[in-house]
């Protein structure tokens, strides 16, 4: 615990950086997770699922 304190919490700049890095990592994980939930709930109703019915194949 002492090493964690000396590495992150003792210096305000390092602490703020750790908070921002943690928030960024959480945002990425949350966003990806919610996208997967949304895609699962709306499977077959999104443009990416029905595009092949309306767009002709490119040559």
Swiss-Prot record:
Residues that span the membrane, as ranges: 16-41
Keywords (A to Z) from UniProt: Electron transport, Membrane, Mitochondrion, Mitochondrion inner membrane, Respiratory chain, Transmembrane, Transmembrane helix, Transport
Topological domain ranges for the Mitochondrial matrix compartment: 1-15
SUPFAM superfamilies hit by this protein: Subunit X (non-heme 7 kDa protein) of cytochrome bc1 complex (Ubiquinol-cytochrome c reductase)
Membrane topology: Single-pass membrane protein
Stretches in topological domain Mitochondrial intermembrane: 42-59
One GO cellular component, as annotated: respiratory chain complex III
Function noted in UniProt: Component of the ubiquinol-cytochrome c oxidoreductase, a multisubunit transmembrane complex that is part of the mitochondrial electron transport chain which drives oxidative phosphorylation.
Coiled coil start-end: none
Domain of life assignment: Eukaryota
GO BP, sorted A to Z: mitochondrial electron transport, ubiquinol to cytochrome c
Family named by the database record: Belongs to the UQCR10/QCR9 family.
Compartments reported by the entry: Mitochondrion inner membrane
Assembly description: Component of the ubiquinol-cytochrome c oxidoreductase (cytochrome b-c1 complex, complex III, CIII), a multisubunit enzyme composed of 10 subunits. The complex is composed of 3 respiratory subunits cytochrome b (cob), cytochrome c1 (cyt-1) and Rieske protein (fes-1), 2 core protein subunits pep and ucr-1, and 5 low-molecular weight protein subunits qcr6, qcr7, qcr8, qcr9 and probably NCU16844/qcr10.
Protein name: Cytochrome b-c1 complex subunit 9, mitochondrial
């Amino acid at each position: 615990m002492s090493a964690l304190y000396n590495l992150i919490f003792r210096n305000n700049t390092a602490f703020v950086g750790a908070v921002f890095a943690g928030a960024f990592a959480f945002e990425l994980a949350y966003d990806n997770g919610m996208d997967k939930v949304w895609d699962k709930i709306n499977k077959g109703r999104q443009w990416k699922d029905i595009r092949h019915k309306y767009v002709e194949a490119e040559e």
